[in-house]
């Protein structure tokens, strides 16, 4: 019922047909199976057999940010923006929050803007969550997407196991139930907006609606928040938590602005590189 309601919202808000939404949400192989159903399907993904690693403890700064996030959720700020500088350890905070949701019997949806980021995170998260991790994105084969889709829609499995579904934009359309938390990492990234074909939806906005339908919490993470999210946070519509210290106390790099127009006029360029940049590289 909630999945149909979400599809209906996407159809109305983004002005497309419900059929276009369903086409984007359902694995392509499901249509083929209706026409020519195979006699037997085998599991495509081997179960994880590697070691399960413990979750690393947070630094005092990270722990303070995590506590602030949970305090805001307790104060009915269901959407929180985590404004953390680059390399501040936002992912570590995500992992702790994910584990808390799994311990509470809830599922978690973890959205990243690029499929490449999904690949990088998978190995790290799988060492912690094992077979509870489900990866879903558009570069999977039809058979792989169907397998994961069925794993998510298997209600008996959902009852006995809680999942962390990590994926790019299309993962927000999955029929995951019993969601306790939706994480939208790098929430400012334009890749969350579908351009072609329809439905031309924004995964961040869709995730917020999905969370409202399931009474789940939302955590938006970014070092450079989008204008709209930061505005809502400043106005108090969203909760705001700032993580301004890089993990391990590493200082932020110094930034120098170079006027390339002046560099060209002064002939202080080496091919396409300014002389100050070349000097710093040589150092």
Predicted regions and their residues:
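Conserved interdomain hinge at the start of the Helicase C-terminal
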Residues: 75, 95-101, 258-283
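Generic structural signal for residues in well-ordered beta-strands
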Residues: 133, 255-257
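Accessory, non-ATPase domains that flank or precede helicase/AAA+ motor cores in DNA-metabolism machines
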Residues: 1-222, 229, 234-250, 283
């Amino acid at each position: 019922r909630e999945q149909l309601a979400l599809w209906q919202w996407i159809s109305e808000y983004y002005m497309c047909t419900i059929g276009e939404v369903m086409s984007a949400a359902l694995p392509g192989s499901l249509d083929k199976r209706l026409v020519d159903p195979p006699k037997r399907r085998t599991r495509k993904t081997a179960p994880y057999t590697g070691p399960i690693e413990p979750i690393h403890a947070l630094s005092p700064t990270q722990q303070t940010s995590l506590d602030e996030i949970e305090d805001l959720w307790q104060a009915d700020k269901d959407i929180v923006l985590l404004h953390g500088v680059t390399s501040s350890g936002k992912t570590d905070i995500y992992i702790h929050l994910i584990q808390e949701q799994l311990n509470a019997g809830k599922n978690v949806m973890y959205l990243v803007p690029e499929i490449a980021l999904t690949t990088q995170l998978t190995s790290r998260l799988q060492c912690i969550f094992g077979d509870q991790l489900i990866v879903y994105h558009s570069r999977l084969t039809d058979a792989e997407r169907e397998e994961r889709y069925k794993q998510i829609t298997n209600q008996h499995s959902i009852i006995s196991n809680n999942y962390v579904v990590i994926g790019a934009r299309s993962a927000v359309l999955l029929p995951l139930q019993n969601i306790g938390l939706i994480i939208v990492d790098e929430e400012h990234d334009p890749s969350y907006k579908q351009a072609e074909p329809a439905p031309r939806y924004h995964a961040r906005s869709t995730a917020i609606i999905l969370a409202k339908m399931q009474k789940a919490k939302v955590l938006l993470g970014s070092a450079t928040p989008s204008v709209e999210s930061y505005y809502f946070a400043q106005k108090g519509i969203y909760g705001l938590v700032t993580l301004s210290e890089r993990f391990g106390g590493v200082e932020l790099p110094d930034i120098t602005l170079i006027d390339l127009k002046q560099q060209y006029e002064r002939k202080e360029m080496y091919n396409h590189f300014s002389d100050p940049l070349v000097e710093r590289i040589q150092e």
